[in-house]
Amino acid sequence: MGKCSYRFISLQTLTPNSLLDHSPNPTIWAKPLQIGSLTLHSRVLQSPLSGVTDLVFRRLVRRYAPQAMLYTEMVSATEIHHLRTLPQVMEIDPRENPISIQLFDCRPDFMAEAAQKAVAQGAQSVDINMGCPVNKITKKGGGSSLLRQPAVAEAIVKTVVAAVDVPVTVKTRLGWDDGEINIVEFAQRLQDAGAQMLTLHGRTRAQGYNGRARWQWIAKVKQALTIPVIANGDIFSVEAAIACLEETGADGVMCSRGSLGYPFLVGEIEHFFKTGEKRKAPTVAEKLTCAQEHLQMLWEYKGQRGLFQARKHLAWYCKDFPGAAALREQLFQINSVQEGKDLLDQAISTAKLCL
């Protein structure tokens, strides 16, 4: 059976326990992962997501995934250079460890300065964003535009590595578009420059988040490198994580969009990797209770700005249950914390009656 066929079957018909039988070495998923001087006791990572992975979101993920690597939202090195005080997105709670701050820019000197400030804030590693596909980032020479500037990318890694005493890692994509998939050579240059881990999203910049992640390219990069390679893209379940590792041979997986409105995902995968058992999924009432807590925490942490940001998070929680669409629409328009809590209280009561 070819790998593409296996991937389809693994996601559709195989249980997590039967997937263990298909893996050449499932026990490796429970072993620590060494990233330079940093030892990770989980092979599941929560992706940095702009406007999402703030301190509040990370606390929720950490609750269910006690050992997974967490990341801040990506931070502009230029912004850090010009501001007298560090932006709130760089705030770290020591209880979050292991934690990394992700930076983006195209200027090696600014990146080195920002990396030093990140470490001073408590970051246990520094991640360099070379994959963001958003125009406002790429037009400034950051994110995935660095895939077209390998010499600059290499210089950034070398300069940051020389500036800090923690592991320096990179998150990137396959290439700019299908005509410029240069990831194997690009990844080798990053490794030679001193990067100590590479996270690879299996799509090009042109794809954005469309189509399926091409895990076969992650497998090619894994075979070409000696540093750890983390697979990213389409990790929406325990089953997907297992299928991805089986196909790619990667050293771990990074969850991104699968965690939106579902901060349980990283913990579910982490639990399975360590025990071989699938954790019971939260009920609708439990998910909505988590949403309610998310709302309250955002309000306490950010005030009115947190309330506005909460709308999208609350909407993400509302899926896969009767009445979800209507509740999502209502929550997206709330103007007070109490309004949101009342709507969620009603939905939680209804969900409990349906158990």
Swiss-Prot record:
Its cofactor is FMN. Keywords: Flavoprotein, FMN, NADP, Oxidoreductase, RNA-binding, tRNA processing, tRNA-binding. GO terms for molecular function: flavin adenine dinucleotide binding; tRNA binding; tRNA dihydrouridine synthase activity. FMN binds at P48, L49, S50, Q102, K171, N232, G233, D234, S256, R257. InterPro entries: Aldolase_TIM, DUS-like_FMN-bd, DUS_fam, DusB-like, tRNA-dHydroUridine_Synthase_C, tRNA_hU_synthase_CS. It catalyses: a 5,6-dihydrouridine in tRNA + NAD(+) = a uridine in tRNA + NADH + H(+); a 5,6-dihydrouridine in tRNA + NADP(+) = a uridine in tRNA + NADPH + H(+). Its EC number is 1.3.1.-. It is an enzyme of class 1 (oxidoreductase). The active site is at C132. Signal peptide: none annotated. Belongs to the Dus family. Catalyzes the synthesis of 5,6-dihydrouridine (D), a modified base found in the D-loop of most tRNAs, via the reduction of the C5-C6 double bond in target uridines. PANTHER family: TRNA-DIHYDROURIDINE(47) SYNTHASE [NAD(P)(+)]-LIKE (PTHR45846:SF1). This is Probable tRNA-dihydrouridine synthase 1. It comes from Synechocystis sp. (strain ATCC 27184 / PCC 6803 / Kazusa).
